[in-house]
Amino acid sequence: FADGRENVTGHAAAYTKETPFALEPTLTEVRLHPGERVQVDVKVVPRKCIADPEMKLYQYTAIDEYTRIRFLYGYEEQSTYSSADFVKRLVKWYKRRGITVKCIQTDNGFEFTNRFSPSKRDKKTLFENTLSQLGIEHKLIRPYTPRHNGKVERSHREDHNKFYSCHRFYSCDDLNVQLAARLSRTNNRPMRPLKWFSPIEFLNNSVQYD
């Protein structure tokens, strides 16, 4: 739309000439099918939610840009090893639902890429090597521009306000049990960008199973 509202697939439409600023081209791209691009990011679990003050926990999130269906998994470290494990899990999880992941988009964190590492810039991370082995394209957003991963960023803000504000975790296993329940609720909740279908309903209307 000319005023920047989102269309049914959740992608901002092009602005008019009267708009006082220009959008990045990546923000106007329209996804045509599930799995075409999946946004991935990491959320640090708030300390107040963790029973053990010495423990750190991290929520990895994947969200399909077309259907908005998410996959969540918790880890005890934010590293390229966790990222590589997560991508293997998300590929299998989406595949079981009829989605073949073609491209994964991330920010420039060291858990994903060595792009800005002074000493390892030319060395691929385990995450990047895993993507190559799986035949998945890796797209990096512009540095310091989290809005380019806006769907997963917004989902994290909602998790912070509606999930982490009222839950407590005693281990990483406990986090994953509670994340599974959270995932089921959010994937089955109607969304305005999907014309009030839930991500699961929108997915079922979009995917042809073998």
Mark where each language-model region is.
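Active-site beta-loop-alpha junctions of metal-dependent nucleic acid enzymes
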Residues: 55, 73-100
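Short, solvent-exposed loop/turn segments at secondary-structure boundaries
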Residues: 51, 74-75, 115-120
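Short small-residue beta-strand/loop micro-motif enriched in glycine and branched aliphatics
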Residues: 69-73, 139-141, 165
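C-terminal domain-tail junction helix/linker
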Residues: 10, 16-17, 21-30, 36, ...
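Acidic/histidine-rich, metal-coordinating catalytic segments
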Residues: 97-119, 142-144, 197-199
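RNase H-like polynucleotidyl transferase catalytic core
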Residues: 105-108, 120-150, 168-170
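Mobile-element integrase/transposase regions
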Residues: 2-63, 69, 85, 96
